[in-house]
Every structure is written in C-alpha cells, then in structure tokens.
Amino acid sequence: MRKGLWMLSLCFLALPIGAQNEKENGEKAKSVEMKEVTVEAARVTKKVDGLLIIPSAAQREASTDGYSLLAKLSLPRLRVDEVMRTVTPLMNDGSVQIRLNGTLASKEDLLSLDPKLVKNIDFIDNPGVRYGDGIGFVIDIRTKRNTTGYVFGADLSNSVTTVNGGNTLYAKYNHKNSELALTFTSLYKDQHGFRSSEVADYTLNNGCHYLVSRNQTDGRSRRFGNQFEIKYSLADSATYVFQANLSVGGGNTPGNYADFVYRDGTIEQTYRTINVSSDFSPTLDLYFFHQLGKHQSVTANVVGSSIYTDKRGYNGEGRTYAYDVDGRTWSLESEAIYENKLKPFTLSAGLEHSVSFTNNEYTGDVSALNKMRRGELYLFSEVKGRWKRIGYSAGVGVANKTYSQENYSFDYWTFRPKLTLNYDILTGLNARYTFETYRRVSSYAMVSDAKIRENSREWKVGNPNLQPSRVIKNIFDISYNGSRVSCGANIEYRRDLGSNMSVYERTPADEFLYSQQNIGNIMMFVVQNYVRYDVVPEHLSVTLFGGINRFFNISSLYRHYLTSYNYGGNIQAYLGRWTLTGYADNGWKYVEGEHEGRNGAAIYFGVSYRWSRCSLSLFMQHPFQQHPVIQRGKVLNENLYKTYSYRSRDLGNMITLKFSWKLSRGKSYKEIEKKVQNEGYKQTGIM
C-alpha cells in the first residue's frame, strides 16, 4: 500500500511537465483575460493566493445551489457534502470561510444562490494577513445582480431512510439600486442509530491496571433549528454599496440521551447520559463600501451579536452527576479597509477591532461562574502585484490581544509577517513558495476555570493560564492548469512552538484530569497531490488526489509520532438534463498531543434531473454499509490508554431526496463585492 502511494505521488509530481504537450485544444479556444496569469482555454487561472475558477455552462446548469456548484468544482484538498451542507478540509489545514460577493456567507445564502448568475469563484488556498488566524481556505463566489425583478424559490432536502433534513424558502425583490431579500430555513434531525464503544486501561497509583469497557446500547440524537434572515442593500455599481443584514436563529436538542453498559470484569452496570441544550442568537451586520476614483476604495463593517445558551448535562456512571449551564455572550466587531490599485501592485491596509463579554454560570454538581472579557486590535498592511514572471504578496499584521477572567488576565502583542512568491515557469505551469508566522490562541472553552466530569474516572479541566503558541509555516507548491488537465503538488512544513498540548494528571484518588498546557511543540510535514482530467470536455471529468502526512508531538512529558495516508477521487458526468456524481475518500488520520484520531471514509453517489424551473436529485451516502464508522481514536497517555469508535446506522445507506424550484424575472448588472468578514463572535466559551 505504501509503495503504491509513493508511486501515485511521483506520478502527480510528473504530470505538470507532461501536460505541456496538450496544445491542439488550446489553439481553438479563446483566452480568459485576467490581470493574473492568463491560460489559453482554461477555466482555471492561477493567482498568487490561489485559483480563479470560471464554472462551465454545464456545471452552472446542473447545479441547484451554492453547495451543489462547489461540489462539482473538485476543489483541491476540500470535501464538499451537498447533502449535509458542509465544506471540510481533508487535513487539519484550518477552517473554510465561504463568502458571497466578498461578504461572509451563511448556509442560507448558499442555499438561495442561483448558480446561473455566478460569474467566477475566487478560491484562496493561501489567505493573506487581512484574514484571521486559523483560516486555511477562502471561497468567494461572485455573482451578477438583478436591477429590476424578483426571485422566489425553495430548496427542500429530506432523507427517506432516516429523520433528517433541511428546507429553505427565499425571496428577493429588486428595484433600481435597492434589493430586499428574505430567507427562512428549518432544520431537523431525530436519529436513533448512533453508537459509541470504548475500551479504557487505567494505570492506578498502586500499579494495577483497571480495564473498563463502555458500549452504547441505545440512544437518541435530536436537533431542531430555525433561521430567519432579512437583508437590505442599496448599491450603485460604480461608486457605493450599503448593506444591512439582520438574522435571528435558534435551536434546541430535546430528549437527547444515550444508554450504556459498563463492564470492568467484576461489575456490569447500565447507565444513561443526557445532553440537552437550547440556543438563540440575533446578529446585526452593517456594511459600507465607497469607490474613490478609479483606483481607490474604502470599506467599513460593523457586526453586533449575542448568543444565549442553556445546557443540561447528566451522567449516571457510578454516582449520579448533573449540572446546568446558563450561558450568555455578547460581541461587537468592526473593520475598516483602504485599498489602492497602483501600478504594478495593489496596496491594502486596515484595522480590525473586536470585543466580547461572556458570562457562563454552572450550577448543580459543577459550581462555577465564568466571566470572561476578550479584546483585540489588529492592524495590517499588504502589497500584492507582479513583475515579469514573478507574482508576489507581502504583508504584515500586528495585534494587541487582551483577556481577563477573575484573577487571571493577560495582555500581549503578536506579529504576523507573510511572504508569497509565485513564478510562471511555462504557460500554465507555476511554482509558489509561502512563509508565514503568527501566534495561535486557544479556544474560549479551554481557558475557563470550570471542571466537568466526563465519566466516573475522567474530568475535563480548563486552564486560564494557557498562553498563545507560535506557528511557523513553510509551503511550496507546483501546479499546472491546462485546457483539459489540472494538477498540482503541495508540500508544507508547519511548526507549532509552545503549543497547548493535552495533559492527563492522575490524582491520589485515581481520577484522571484532562487539561491543556504549554508544554512542547507540534510539527507536521505534509505532501498532497491532485490531478483533474476532463475526459470529455463539458460532459465527463475525473479527479484523483492523495497525500502523505507525518506528525511529530514532542513535549516535556511524552513524544508521539504518526505517518498517515489519504487518497480519494470524484467523477462528474453531465448528460443533458441528467447529472451523475460520485465521490470517495479514505478519511484522514492525525495525532495531536496525546490524542490520535481518524475521521471515517466518505462515499457519495448522486443523480439529478432538471426540468424547466425545477430540479430533482437523489443522493446515497455510505452505500453498502450498515453501520459506517464516523470516527475512531485513541488516548496515548502512559497512565490512560483508550480506544474508541463512533458508528451511525442512520448514515449507512442513507438516501436523500432534494427538490429545488426557482421562479425569477429581472435584468442583471455588475455584482456587489463586499470585502469584509467577521466570524469570531460564534464562540460561546462553554465546555
């Protein structure tokens, strides 16, 4: 298996050179004119920070919404699930940020998107300093907009083999420079097929090994949620844009429980765990853009939000353990950006400011009051341009971050330089190098001072003394984009110095306390490759990808290493009104701290038929699998060794029907492009 994967990697690395012979089709097609690299007949244009993708007419016609379109683009190193409505990196490469005409897009925005109005997609796999830490990919979908007319539509997705679905209704009305849009989404899930199993080996203080198994025998997982959004925008295509967006969302998980059998060789016990919650979150987003002459522009954005969360936890293993959480979070985020398109480069500079207040009160068997305040001021500047065959992007960001919680507080500065150089070797063949360093901050929840019991032996403990770690990245990639072949190889070496790593502390009472501490370094070396081939242009395309990953976790308490492999592929066929899709990957395996995990493999098949204003699709997930593994993992501590797995009968052979209907009328003009994003307010800080 390993030898085969190495051969696959070498083949991918060789493909860019061999693909240069592909000339006969390129001579007949027109070129795509861009300010970046121009590739004859290619629907993909290489940029310093990623790819500019122009979807084909067949892809637009065959897509029903934003997720459907993204799934057909075979984006490198991403898994797009249009049934579950998720976009996930194939490795731990940071989060994916999706935007619509520059503004951060919600699920509702993507579901109400008309693919036929999409002009291009800016796929950024190398985000600059103006994006927040931890953002690995940015997908900006740019569309046309109607000046007069209306749009009504519905996107209904419901599983027939299990209780799971999401239904969206939307409407837009345009008059001259104004647009009013309404969107309502209802999500539901009520499943009984989730099962977990666990075997733990505890080394006690007296040196004895205490073996325990916990196997789930029954359970129920429910989630009901609604989201309503109203958006007004006023835009003159040449000079200004104003947009106001008010959204209100909420959900609850009533009646969630799981029944287990506990065995330790002498005792067999049945017990139940309960985890129910409800949440409510209103958000107001105000945005303004103004064009100053031909080359300059200013952008401003303010987002205010609040999150109200009530949670109840119960664990019947051993003695009864129950607690409640009353959580409140308020946040305000603002950003301003200045951009000047000079020759031969573009200069951008700006500032971001955010402040949040969190008040989480734990009662019952957990007694804690977490009052946390976080603030950040971030200044950045970036230059991007071209000189002959060389494209470049250089930027620097400086941030002042503050945090306080009762007797704990810190105030520190971070420095984030980033440099990217891109060289055009030949037409369509590019090489790129990126260097970046920044400080990474732990999640809100892990810096609280709460202590939560996981089971009769284990506890999760927050650590308010956690300090930011230093991340250093060196990335090299080479890619080729031709008329029928696109391929590339990405090599990354990442170091996380002074990382917050997992620590298990054994108490005199033989309890095991999990926390995070700054005790070492985590390194990762990754090689990832992909190749896409249009077997029959506009009708049949095939994509293959593979990767080799090496992890190093070195701390003052332990050392863990891992080599893993991931591979997969997809196929798209456009046959008139019919569209056939298939996707498969083997999941991905990693080790971080003392936790080794493997996400389960994914297999999807889909067929859709479009007629007039309607489209009907059928999807099957995890075919021929009764209980597919969703995740496996291990705890590698010297005093606590554990293996666990999660399976789902509901996801096995899951069949989902999707119906889309759209009625529209109007004329289109230049798109709105909003360039500010805010998403830090989504953390609640609840453990």
Identify the role of each PLM range.
Residues Y67-T103:
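Extracytoplasmic beta-strand/coil segments of soluble accessory domains associated
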Residues V163-D190, N206-N256, F280-G293, G569:
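Transmembrane beta-barrel wall of Gram-negative outer-membrane proteins
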Residues E36, G66-A71, R85-T88, E108, ...:
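N-terminal periplasmic accessory domains that precede
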Residues F410, T427-L429, R439-G488, R495, ...:
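Outer-membrane beta-barrel signature, preferentially recognizing the C-terminal barrel domain
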Residues G225-G251, I274-Y408, Y412-P417, D424-G428, ...:
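Face-selective signature of the C-terminal outer-membrane beta-barrel domain
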Residues S331-E335, Y378, N463, Q467, ...:
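Outer membrane beta-barrel strand-and-loop segments of large Gram-negative receptors
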Residues N101-G128:
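Short acidic/polar hinge/loop motifs at secondary-structure boundaries
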Residues N21-R60, V83-M84:
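Short, acidic, small-residue-rich periplasmic hinge/interaction motif at the N-terminus
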